[in-house]
Every structure is written in structure tokens, then in C-alpha cells.
Amino acid sequence: MRKLVLFTLLLILPALTMRPLTQTAAAPHSDLEEKSICLTFDDGPTDSTTPHILDILKSENVKATFFVIGKQVRSREEILRREYEEGHRIAIHTYSHEYKAIYTSEETLRSDILQCRKAILKVLPAWNCDLYRFPGGSWGIRDELKETVKKMKLRAVDWNASAEDAVNPAATADKLFDYVLSSAGNRKHIVLLMHDGVGYKATVQALPKIIQYFREKGYKFQLL
């Protein structure tokens, strides 16, 4: 019996330790010979963070993709409108960001997505985008839930580099910059995860340095 338990652990432990720090992502639309990076921001819009992110992006002439929380659009319609009018891509993230409510069933996931879509369309009637990001990423999401997203004609997009700002809320801007570099590695096509939720001051502070670094390395900034 002891040998059987040991053998089982030897099979399971490698699978647990090999879980990636960042999720896989399809390469952005780009010439395969050209290095590219897509900046993506989850969990906005917010009053405290999103406008500062937009100011920096405008100053640097860089476009980004914002994965929106639908319930946060109310009272922040002008921020969402600004994202759209300044040429950024607005995509569906979630309405509530409450994992238990979202992932209970195919119907609860579908309802959450539709509510988010409705909140965006109420502000931007001409908006159209087929991108979706699972709250927490698609790692470990049940197959039937992934299929629900496909049936809704949406493309689920994860990431392959991250500032780790959501899991390290006390990190300094320099530390977030280090996380970005270590997770991006030498990838030719990068989809970078950051957040514009409440309290992401260090993300705002790190963003100019992140943009400068990848620009100097010859990366082209693209929308998803």
C-alpha cells in the first residue's frame, strides 16, 4: 500500500509543480519575423487607475486592449468612452468577477458574459469585439465552459507574460517591471497581463518603463 501511495505521488507532483505562472496565449496578428507585444489590462474601468493608464498610453502613442468588468461601467461611462475613442480595444472580461457565481454552470457563465456585453453596448452602441478573457485565465476551466464561450462566437484570450500585479499588491513598480521581464523572457510575440482595477498605483508607475524597454528592444505594440 505504501509503495502504491508513493508511486501515485510521483505521478501527481510533477503535474502540480509544472503549472505555468502565466497562461498560454495565441500570438497576436503579426508578421512572424517581427517582434510584437500586446498590452492588456483587466478589471477596469476604475476612477483611480484607468485614467492614468490612458494618459500614459496617449503620451506614448500606444494602444492597448482592456478586458472590462461590466458592473464597473456604471458611473464610469466617460472612462469607457475615452478608451474607445482613443483607439483602444474593449473586450469582455466579466460582469461580476465572482468566480463561484460565474463558473457554477454553463448558464451562469453565459449570463455573466451577456450582462457584461449589455453594459458595454449601453455606453457604446457601435461597439463590437469577439475577444473574451476568463476571470483568472482559462487554466483549469472545465471543457463545457470553454465550449460555451465558443458557442457564443467569442475567442478566449489568455496571456504569456504578466506583471503579477494582482497577486503581489504590495510590489513596487520596479518589482513589477522585473516580473514582466522574467515572464516575457525572449518571446517574440508577447501578450502582457496587467490590471487597471482599484489600487494599482505601482502598475501605473511601472508602465512607462515597460513601454520604453520593449520599444528599445524593437517590439511593435499591437492590439489583440
Model-predicted segments: where are they?
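Catalytic domains of cell-wall/extracellular-matrix polysaccharide-remodeling enzymes
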Residues: 52, 97-193, 197-215, 219-220
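A cross-family glycoside hydrolase active-site/sugar-binding cleft signature
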Residues: 40, 65-69, 91-93, 133-135, ...
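Sec-dependent N-terminal signal peptides of Gram-positive bacterial secreted proteins and lipoproteins
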Residues: 4-19
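Sec/Tat signal peptide C-region and signal peptidase I cleavage site
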Residues: 19-25
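Active-site beta->alpha N-cap acidic-glycine motif
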Residues: 25-104, 114-122, 128-129
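C-terminal domain-boundary segment and adjacent tail
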Residues: 28-32, 59-61, 71-74, 199-224
